[in-house]
């Protein structure tokens, strides 16, 4: 009886038939075909199924050369021949070679150290930009006109100094009642703090 079971052709479910049905049922779209048309009453024997699989493999071609794994491009350093996975990583690595050898003439990534031509006339400090020098000079004067000649901001400070106060200096907190200016409107109430 065991020999008869081994020699008799076995019935095998068609895996492609069920894959197609699953695709139609997943879409949830109605078809004009009835479900009985989708299901074939024909069941494959094991031999037919194996023959069908061999036909599918034969159609594929089976060339192992055609199935190539997509290799990631590698970028190689021209100096030490190290390889990197990205061009940006190679660029960062090349910068290390430039710093080791003292840089090149065509190296445009490093900032140039220009001669500092803006010199403070009070203390002699030099600055790269005139704006930095102007900000530095504010620490030398206490709201009054500086003694240095040839500074463009001196005339501006002297023209505003006739008012008796400088907006750049923190105001003095203590006022006497005599220093307070009264408003011409008598009905104006004092501001609450």
From Swiss-Prot:
PANTHER family assigned: C2H2 TYPE ZINC FINGER TRANSCRIPTION FACTOR FAMILY-RELATED, ZINC FINGER PROTEIN AZF3-RELATED
Major location (coarse): nucleus
Subcellular localization(s) per the UniProt record: Nucleus
Induction: By abscisic acid (ABA), ethylene, salt, cold and heat.
Protein name: Zinc finger protein AZF3
Keyword Transcription regulation recorded: yes
Zinc finger (C2H2-type): 75-97, 118-140
Described function: Transcriptional repressor probably involved in abiotic stress responses. Binds DNA in a sequence-specific manner and can repress the transactivation activity of other transcription factors.
PROSITE patterns: ZINC_FINGER_C2H2_1, ZINC_FINGER_C2H2_2
Transcription found in the keyword field: yes
Disulfide cysteine pairs (residue numbers): none
GO cellular component: nucleus
């Amino acid at each position: 009886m065991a020999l008869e079971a081994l020699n008799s052709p076995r019935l095998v479910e068609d895996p492609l038939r069920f894959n197609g049905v699953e695709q139609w049922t997943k879409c949830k779209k109605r078809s004009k075909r009835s479900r009985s048309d989708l299901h074939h009453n024909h069941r494959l024997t094991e031999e037919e199924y194996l023959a069908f699989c061999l036909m599918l493999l034969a159609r594929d071609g089976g060339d192992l050369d055609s199935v190539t794994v997509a290799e990631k491009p590698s970028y190689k350093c021209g100096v030490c021949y190290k390889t990197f996975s990205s061009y940006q990583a190679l660029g960062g690595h090349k910068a290390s070679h430039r710093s080791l050898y003292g840089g090149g003439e065509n190296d445009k990534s490093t900032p140039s150290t220009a001669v500092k031509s803006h010199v403070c006339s009070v203390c002699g400090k030099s600055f790269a930009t005139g704006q930095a020098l102007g900000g530095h000079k504010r620490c030398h004067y206490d709201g009054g006109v500086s003694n240095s000649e040839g500074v463009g901001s001196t005339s501006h400070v002297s023209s505003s100094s006739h008012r008796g106060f400088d907006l750049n200096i923190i105001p003095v907190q203590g006022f006497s009642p005599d220093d307070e200016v009264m408003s011409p409107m008598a009905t104006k109430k004092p501001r609450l703090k």
